[in-house]
Amino acid sequence: MIFNVLTIFPQMFPGPLGVSNLGSALKKGLWTLNVFDIRAFANNKHNTVDDTPYGGGPGMLLRADVLGRCIDEVLSLHPNTKLMFTSPRGVSFTQDIARQTMNFDNITLLCGRFEGIDERVVDFYKLQEVSIGDYVLSGGELAAMVIIDTCVRMVPGVIGNAESLKQESMEGSLEYPQYTRPASWKGMEVPEVLLTGNHGEIEKWRRNASLSITAARRPDLLKDRYGENDVE
């Protein structure tokens, strides 16, 4: 699986993507990271990549001509790549969208900066806009890392224990509480059922705990899974 990242801060990568399981998988060639410096496509003395928005307003926008040259370079190397743009106005990047993204062998992520990018770039290249949450970041690099992390960990061989992927959160409910040694800590005991060895009862406890946490913290997930009336 190949990821191409377009950014004005190439030094940010691989960053956290270069450590732990993902870093080892990167070194083994289970996935590939190509970083493109947008400033290299500025074609001007000062490597200027931004300009003021037409119609006025605060901040600066990444220029269409600069981004266009960068994207065209990527497309010349990877003509079948999926083009994505990290944007606070994009669709929420969920586990389902991550799985859909995994249908592509090559993915390109354009990282926004300043007040955004010229809208013509989105329209011309038909960029899929994705958001990792209802908040504003200084740039799209961190969002790109989140997206890459979410996808790469589903690549076979990246996560050592494949069973971990099957028990992941966000499958319609949040994860149940987990405990390890010592069994007693600061007067707090591990739930007795987890010490019984009765796998049927343990599974039942975990399922109920998961549903309780989800109902309290993310009832929207249960409504999506079971419907409005069943949750209430």
From Swiss-Prot:
Enzyme Commission number, as recorded: 2.1.1.228
Single GO cellular component term: cytosol
Query: What's a single GO BP term from this record?
Result: tRNA N1-guanine methylation
One of the Pfam families matching this protein, by short name: tRNA_m1G_MT
Coarse class of the protein's main subcellular location: cytoplasm
The record's annotation in InterPro entries points to: Alpha/beta_knot_MTases, tRNA_m1G_MeTrfase_C_sf, tRNA_m1G_MeTrfase_TrmD, tRNA_m1G_MTases_N, tRNA_MeTrfase_TRMD/TRM10
Binding-site residues for S-adenosyl-L-methionine, renumbered to this chain: 112, 132-137
Name the Gene3D superfamilies for this protein: 3.40.1280.10, tRNA(m1g37)methyltransferase, domain 2 (1.10.1270.20)
Q: Does the keyword Glycoprotein apply?
A: no
Tell me the compartments it is located in: Cytoplasm
Would the keyword Methyltransferase be found if you checked this record's keyword annotation? yes
Q: Which UniProt keywords apply?
A: Cytoplasm, Methyltransferase, S-adenosyl-L-methionine, Transferase, tRNA processing
Q: Which domain of life is it from?
A: Bacteria
Q: How does it assemble?
A: Homodimer.
UniProt name for this protein: tRNA (guanine-N(1)-)-methyltransferase
Source species taxonomy: Bacteria, Pseudomonadati, Pseudomonadota, Alphaproteobacteria, Rickettsiales
